[in-house]
C-alpha cells in the first residue's frame, strides 16, 4: 500500500505487487543468502515461486542450501503465501513430515500484514534458523528432501 495525493491510501493490485517482487528477486537481495523467483514464467497468475536460503553462520545450518516453495493464492498479499521447505530441515516452525511452515509457529505468517513480502518471509526464516531453539537442532542429512 502507498499513500496517494492528499494522504489517501492506494492499494497496489496483486499482479503489480508480484511483478515488483519478481523484479526485486531477480536483482538479488541483500547479502545474497536468500533469493527467490517464479517457478513458471508462463504462469500469468504468478502463483508458484521457489525460494533459496543459505544457512546462517555459527549454526548447524551453516553452508547448507535450503530450497522452499511459496504458493501465492488469489488472496495474496492480503493473506500470506503457503510456504513449504523442499529441502529437509529440522526447525520448530516446520512440520517434520511435510516441510510446511506452520503459520501458528512462525510469527511473520501468524501476524501477516499486506506490506510483507516473500523476501521478508525468507529473511525471517533465516533469522529463525539462528534462534536458540533452532541453531543447534540435529539436522537431516544434507541433500534430502520432503
Curated annotation (Swiss-Prot):
Transmembrane intervals: none
SUPFAM superfamilies: UBC-like (SSF54495)
Phenotype upon loss of function: Plants do not display apparent morphological variations, but are sensitive to the DNA-damaging agent MMS.
Domain UBC core intervals: 13-146
Induction field: Not induced by stresses.
Tissue: Expressed in roots, shoots, leaves, stems, flowers and pollen.
Function: Has no ubiquitin ligase activity on its own. The heterodimer with UBC catalyzes the synthesis of non-canonical poly-ubiquitin chains that are linked through 'Lys-63'. This type of poly-ubiquitination does not lead to protein degradation by the proteasome. Mediates transcriptional activation of target genes. May play a role in the control of progress through the cell cycle and differentiation. Involved in the error-free DNA repair pathway and contributes to the survival of cells after DNA damage.
Family: Belongs to the ubiquitin-conjugating enzyme family.
Subunit-structure text: Heterodimer with UBC35 or UBC36.
Name of this protein: Ubiquitin-conjugating enzyme E2 variant 1D
Species this protein is from: Arabidopsis thaliana
Amino acid at each position: 500500500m502507498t499513500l496517494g495525493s492528499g494522504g489517501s491510501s492506494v492499494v497496489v493490485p496483486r499482479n503489480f505487487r508480484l511483478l515488483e517482487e519478481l523484479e526485486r528477486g531477480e536483482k538479488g537481495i541483500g547479502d545474497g543468502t536468500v533469493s527467490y523467483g517464479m517457478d513458471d514464467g508462463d504462469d500469468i497468475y504468478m502463483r508458484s515461486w521457489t525460494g533459496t536460503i543459505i544457512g546462517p553462520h555459527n549454526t548447524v545450518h551453516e553452508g547448507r542450501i535450503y530450497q522452499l516453495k511459496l504458493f501465492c493464492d488469489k488472496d495474496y498479499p492480503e493473506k500470506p503465501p503457503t510456504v513449504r521447505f523442499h529441502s529437509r530441515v529440522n526447525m520448530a516452525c516446520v512440520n517434520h513430515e511435510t516441510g510446511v511452515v506452520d503459520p501458528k509457529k512462525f510469527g511473520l505468517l501468524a501476524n501477516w500484514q499486506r506490506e510483507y513480502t516473500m523476501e521478508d518471509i525468507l529473511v525471517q526464516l533465516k533469522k529463525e534458523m539462528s534462534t536458540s531453539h533452532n541453531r543447534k537442532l540435529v539436522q537431516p542429512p544434507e541433500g534430502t528432501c520432503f
